[in-house]
């Protein structure tokens, strides 16, 4: 029988790269991993906390289509401030943290980076190491599966039909230069008592080809009917 494997781990070292870059002695390796986990959790919690403070961004619904509108004057968003990945590079006296984000309006706010650095220093107790945080804006946000998953989650929490949310997510990928996409949602869809899975696929998706650059994410969505699981595969290109 065929066994399923994580598409990112399957391609690690070929089309996917590590998100942490550092060396450590074997006895200190676990401490380094725990420190990376604390850094990533602290950044995500900071984004989540500031998003909940209030937002003027709207997701406008029309009878024919739904459009996400981003107000640049606002500090946070409902489904736009999504971190795609966090890269950590450690040197002897410096920790470099690179945050890749779709729409970095929140972190461009005056004093936001300084506040985040203080929170991180308290979390990891970095006394002898200097912390350096930089922000990288994702050039094509809608080719990132994390952003699409967050969009679907926002739609489902607002009682939008799951099929409509999936189709709209597929439509958003037309703005990006990709060759294939697959969206799968599992759980009590539509409030039904029996859990099931629905899937929509468009274009090519060569999961068995290692040289094919495929981005993937698995995202849980908490609804009033229970937890739904969203999986998104995006075939970017072939190397």
From Swiss-Prot:
Localization terms from the record: Plastid, Chloroplast
Positions of disulphide bridges: none
GO molecular function terms listed in the Swiss-Prot or TrEMBL record: rRNA binding; structural constituent of ribosome
Location of region: Disordered: 50-80
Chief localization: plastid
An individual GO BP term: translation
GO cellular component terms, A-Z: chloroplast; cytosolic small ribosomal subunit
Assigned keywords, A-Z: Chloroplast, Plastid, Ribonucleoprotein, Ribosomal protein, RNA-binding, rRNA-binding
Entries under SUPFAM superfamilies matching the protein: Prokaryotic type KH domain (KH-domain type II), Ribosomal protein S3 C-terminal domain
Signal peptide: none
Domain KH type-2: 43-139
Subunit structure: Part of the 30S ribosomal subunit.
Family label: Belongs to the universal ribosomal protein uS3 family.
NCBIfam families in the cross-refs: rpsC_bact (TIGR01009)
Name this polypeptide is given: Small ribosomal subunit protein uS3c
Organism encoding this protein: Agrostis stolonifera
Name of the coding gene: rps3
